[in-house]
């Protein structure tokens, strides 16, 4: 099965809106008058102006146009890649509540029929274990941990046109270009823009061309010794937040008694606008996140997340084991899923092909070549543990150390 992306809709009169943004800074008249002039100017003149404005580097005008996309039956690997774009909104079919036994999967193209057959057999085996877990009473949110990362995902995505141009180029020429499925999605979006919004079909292969990574010679693999480590924290965070609160009200910052600071923070937290909290920033190291947990963390947009690349850092021998699996007597079958994915990926690497991760696993060690990387990754289960994710979440630090519900441990 091969999925696709559809440009469902975009802002009405997109060219006129963007052109109006280009005109307003240099033209007399009100906003409404300038928009009326842009409508009267027609598509050709507006597109010509847009090209001129963009060539001058003023790409922010594209943000006045909004696009809505649907991704149908793409791999979860593609979903994970896409949700990392923070200037976009995503609504994804939940694996916690929906039965995915018949979801289907995206199979990479294999030149060797034997490898294709081995891949299909491994994926079907993982789906079979998922069915067994569900039949035994394991909740869907725990059974999903054995599904391979090639299983189909469906979701809606909305973003402004500037971000859309960025996403298309990353898929086609940048970080996604090494995976055929991602590159094909990028080409499809370019083709749809060329047909409907030609002024957005801005190909930038030189800008997005990937450069080799640089690594210090003495660099050693990171082995976190705690589920969450605070790498850096704001000094005197309470004072900074209180100072920002006072400044926002035209008052001079001043030392407050403990009871005054407490009262101020209570007042702030009772209000819907709490921007003062952003003065206190934290950098956290998450050690041993499952791929499923990483997906949830990624969806929090107000953070700077730096997860290791799956290809270079995945290991199939470390994964979370939900308590519900043990309670239902399905531990042996669950572990079988890990061995199935590990064996299939090893065979793929020997053939220089690299997607079948189950969702429970975590990336910690070397994986495979990047030339046809999507193949081994497709076998990853979401239970795999992603041992190195560095983030800068600005909220809910106090909840970061709470263990995931129902996890019996890491194996």
Which residues does each PLM region occupy?
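A conserved ligand/cofactor-binding region detector
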Residues: 1-411
């Amino acid at each position: 099965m091969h999925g696709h992306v559809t440009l469902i809709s975009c802002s009405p009169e997109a060219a006129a809106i963007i052109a109006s943004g280009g005109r307003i800074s240099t033209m007399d008249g009100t906003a409404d008058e300038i928009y009326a002039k842009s409508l009267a100017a027609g598509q050709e003149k507006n597109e010509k102006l847009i090209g001129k404005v963009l060539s001058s580097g003023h790409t922010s005008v594209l943000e006045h146009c909004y696009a809505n996309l649907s991704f149908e039956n793409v791999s979860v690997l593609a979903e994970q890649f896409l949700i990392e774009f923070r200037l976009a909104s995503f609504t994804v079919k939940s694996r916690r509540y929906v039965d995915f036994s018949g979801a289907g999967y995206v199979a990479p193209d294999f030149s060797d029929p034997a490898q294709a057959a081995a891949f299909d057999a491994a994926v079907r085996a993982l789906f079979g274990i998922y069915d067994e877990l569900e039949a035994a009473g394991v909740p869907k949110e725990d059974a999903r941990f054995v599904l391979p990362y090639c299983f189909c995902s469906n979701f809606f995505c909305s973003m402004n046109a500037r971000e859309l141009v960025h996403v298309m180029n990353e898929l086609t020429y940048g970080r996604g270009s090494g995976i055929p499925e991602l590159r094909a999605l990028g080409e499809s979006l370019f083709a749809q823009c060329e047909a409907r919004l030609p002024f957005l079909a801005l190909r930038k292969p030189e800008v997005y061309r990937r450069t080799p990574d640089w690594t210090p010679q003495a660099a050693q693999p990171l082995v976190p010794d705690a589920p969450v480590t605070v790498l850096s924290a704001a000094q005197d965070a309470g004072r900074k937040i209180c100072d920002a609160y006072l400044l926002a009200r035209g008052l001079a910052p001043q030392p407050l008694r403990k009871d005054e600071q407490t009262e101020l923070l209570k007042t702030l937290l009772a209000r819907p606008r709490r921007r003062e909290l952003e003065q206190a920033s934290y950098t956290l190291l998450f050690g041993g996140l499952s791929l499923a947990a990483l997906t949830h963390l990624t969806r929090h947009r107000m953070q700077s997340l730096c997860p290791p690349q799956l290809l270079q850092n995945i290991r199939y021998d470390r994964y979370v084991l939900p308590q519900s699996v043990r309670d239902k007597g399905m531990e042996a079958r669950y572990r079988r899923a890990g061995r199935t994915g590990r064996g299939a990926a090893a065979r793929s690497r020997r053939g220089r092909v690299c997607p079948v991760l189950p969702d429970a696993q975590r990336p910690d060690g070397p994986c495979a070549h990047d030339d046809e990387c999507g193949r081994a990754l497709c076998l990853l289960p979401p239970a795999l543990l992603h041992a190195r994710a560095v983030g800068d979440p600005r909220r809910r630090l106090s909840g970061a150390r709470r263990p995931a519900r129902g996890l019996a441990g890491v194996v």
